[in-house]
Amino acid sequence: GLLLLGTMLSSWVGTTGASMLMVRPMIKMNAWRKRRSHIMVFFIFLISNMGGCLTPIGDPPLLMGFMRGVPFFWSLHLLPILIFNTVVLLTVFYFLDRRAYRKDIAEGRKPDISKPGTEVHILGLHNLIFLAMIVAAVILSGTLPGMVAFQDVNGAVKGIPVFEDVKLTYPALIEVVIILAAAFLSFKTTKPEIRRKNHFTWGAIKEVAVLFVGIFITMQPALMILKAKGAELGITEPFQMFWATGLLSSFLDNTPTYLVFLTTAGSLGFTEGMQTILGTVPVAMLEAISCGAVFMGANTYI
């Protein structure tokens, strides 16, 4: 039940948010069991990755696509694929878990619901307001650049010059300000006791921040090369895009991998399909890249 609920939440609160929300109850509910390692494997596949495929908020690769012209709700095209894969994985999980559960019971293990902390409590519901602010900020980041008020006479998005040709666009600045404001208000208005009980630390956030800064800086030359030479790779079919994106997403971060192959697809010269900043991408190919990045990103922790 928790796996299905978390999978449904992932596209609307993000895979990271859904994982943080569901992991503590999942661990506590199964703490009495000896055979439980398989639970986190399915947790990672379903909640931490696959469940986020329906919106750009769900998984970072789709956010990169949204920022490059893919419509916000286009990812809902992946719903049938998500349903099929979720049913398959939950069916496999059911039989594996039932077998492990019966072995634990046979050895005399059983849950002790008398211990403190075994009841489910939902605290901090006011944070839904700040979550809505973040969702709005993401949507604005993709819609504001198309408005005349944010464009100069040449049609380019206005912004603040940072370094040579690099500039911080006003839509991006608005997005950052709203998200930081939501985070600040959440931190200040939520009782510290709630974070303490959830064992909240800044460690994971710092690690992800450092990792992403490094990845996105070093990937720029590769993206420029692919934009110019992508058509020469010989990857022209959706199934090729799916496996190439998926395999690399398993060992690299799936966000830059998605961006690399979206750039490649946009450079192939297609005339029919989804219009993006990077070029026209056939719908089937965009679906293949999206599924490869989101679904196979679960194969390793990276």
Task: Identify the meaning behind each predicted range.
Residues G1, I27-N30, F93-R99, S186-F200:
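C-terminal ends of transmembrane helices
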Residues S10, M20-R35, I39-V41, I47, ...:
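Membrane-interfacial helix-loop connectors
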Residues L54, D59-S75, A137-A149:
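Transmembrane helix-loop junctions at the membrane interface of multipass transporters and ion channels
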Residues L89-A156:
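Long, contiguous bundles of hydrophobic transmembrane helices that form the permeation core
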Residues L131-G269:
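Transmembrane helical segments that form the transport core of multi-pass membrane transport proteins
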